[in-house]
Amino acid sequence: MSAGGTQSLLTGFRPIALLTLLCALLYLTGIAAIPPTDRDESRFMQASKQMLESGDWVHIHFQDEPRNKKPVGIYWLQAAAVKIMGQDLNVWWPYRLPSAIAAWLAVLAVYRCGRRLFDPMAGLIAGTALATSFIVVVEAHIAKTDAALLAATTLSMTMLAELFVKRDERALITALLF
């Protein structure tokens, strides 16, 4: 690719669109094909399902036992995804959508961080590397907390990078939110 072609690839929303397309291909392909195989994934799905059935979005349970081991946010996201998608509570793929979305957000955060600290090409390479890493692809297909934790961590690091580069009040406020 010529230098001009590379530069046009790195301008505007093209890098974000490319990374979004890559993530959609990697994270959404097969999301409904494989049933839950990880015991933790089944527990997260069941607890979110029970939350929807009971209408109690505060006291999380797995069967009869309270499930206070993980932050409640992932259960809320999974339950919201099932509700928004309008699927039967026993269909497993909507429970996985928050993980796929979180992995995508982490990729975009890494792109932005690389772009701010170095240049657009570094950001695109870093985002692509994260998007295609085996563990991220796997976690994007599983209804657990790992992808959401990755997104929260990379977003907070990106906000700190923004503060490092800009050193203004708005960047400070944004960084403090994370």
Regions found by a protein language model. Name each.
Residues 2-178:
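Membrane-integral, polyisoprenol-dependent glycosyltransferases
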